[in-house]
């Protein structure tokens, strides 16, 4: 029976992990849908960003009523009390700044969970503003490389205010300042360029490179923070292979680079 017990415990842990992942993915998709509906209306036929968010939600088997509530929150037809968007700031070991975004109905629980994790791993949860100045918001758009040529995309995006256009792993990545995010998105839509994903992300203005053992320790803390039920994304100033470590999101390169 001991073998069966261990096997069941292993299966149960895997299911719990899968359930946590699904819950976090759905939370992020709900935010995407709500944001798209708020900015472009609740009709997916007339709102490219909403249509794309709904497609991703269906791929993740997101419940229909959950999708409908997110759309109605975005259009203002539904107001749900209890959950609110939150941000937290702190330092991981070795001077790595950490910026956390989340959504919670129990702020005391969220703060306690974060404070315990930071403390247990040699870091500390700071006050508002303690590390926010080390990050700036950037807009990010992803377009399949086979959907257009780089020159056409570059001309459309830069004319609308984009900062740069890069290609990585078969995808064009357009980076904008926060204020140009909406204008660039509209320009891409009008040009008929299919955006696969878009988001406002946080880019560090400076990064920290660490020795492998130090880097792994910091990454372990960040992964545990990202696993918390109320956390949707985590940004850091830790650089790994030329890219700032961020979980729950795609992150822009260091600001100004």
Curated annotation (Swiss-Prot):
The principal localisation class reads cytoplasm
Instruction: List, in alphabetical order, the GO biological process terms annotated in this UniProt record.
Output: regulation of DNA-templated transcription
> Is Transcription regulation a UniProt keyword of this protein?
yes
Q: Which cysteines are joined by disulfide bonds?
A: none
Molecular functions per Gene Ontology: DNA binding
| Keyword Transcription regulation in annotation | yes
User: Which residue ranges have biased composition labelled Basic residues?
Assistant: 1-15
The UniProt entry's GO CC annotations, sorted and at most eight, read: cytosol
One Pfam entry for this protein is TACO1_YebC_N
InterPro entries for the chain: Integrase-like_N (IPR017856), TACO1_YebC-like_2nd/3rd_dom (IPR048300), TACO1_YebC_N (IPR049083), Transcrip_reg_TACO1-like (IPR002876), Transcrip_reg_TACO1-like_dom3 (IPR026564), YebC-like (IPR029072)
Q: Where in the cell is it found?
A: Cytoplasm
Which Gene3D superfamilies would you find in this protein's record? 1.10.10.200, 3.30.70.980
Q: Where is this region: Disordered?
A: 1-25
Keywords (alphabetical) are: Cytoplasm, DNA-binding, Transcription, Transcription regulation
UniProt family annotation: Belongs to the TACO1 family.
Can you name this protein?
Probable transcriptional regulatory protein SRU_2667
Organism field? Salinibacter ruber (strain DSM 13855 / M31)
